[in-house]
């Protein structure tokens, strides 16, 4: 198992930790922005399937007419 040769300085540790946290912060901001644009309908990168006409999704619901008793 590999072991670091020297102890990492606290400033370098803090810098790396802040970089790691910053990446998560930007990812969260992008996700919130995308969710906001999807909810308002301003998204240009996703299709909104629920705004399509209903004739594409209509399915026969009355099975009594098709069944023979």
From Swiss-Prot:
Q: Name one GO biological process term.
A: translation
Q: Name one GO molecular function term.
A: structural constituent of ribosome
Alphabetical list of InterPro entries matching this protein: Ribosomal_bL32, Ribosomal_bL32_plant/cyanobact
Per the record, the domain of life is Eukaryota
Cellular component, GO annotation: chloroplast; large ribosomal subunit
Where in or outside the cell?
Answer: Plastid, Chloroplast
Keywords (A to Z) from UniProt = Chloroplast, Plastid, Ribonucleoprotein, Ribosomal protein
Family indicated by similarity: Belongs to the bacterial ribosomal protein bL32 family.
PANTHER family associated with the record: 50S RIBOSOMAL PROTEIN L32, CHLOROPLASTIC (PTHR36083), LARGE RIBOSOMAL SUBUNIT PROTEIN BL32C (PTHR36083:SF1)
Return the protein name: Large ribosomal subunit protein bL32c
């Amino acid at each position: 198992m590999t072991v670091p040769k020297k102890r990492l300085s606290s400033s370098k540790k803090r810098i790396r930790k802040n970089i790691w946290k910053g990446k998560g912060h930007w990812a969260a901001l992008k996700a919130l922005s995308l969710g906001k644009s999807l909810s308002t309908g301003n998204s240009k990168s996703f299709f909104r399937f629920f705004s399509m006409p209903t004739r594409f999704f209509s399915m026969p619901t009355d099975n009594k007419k098709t069944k023979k008793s």
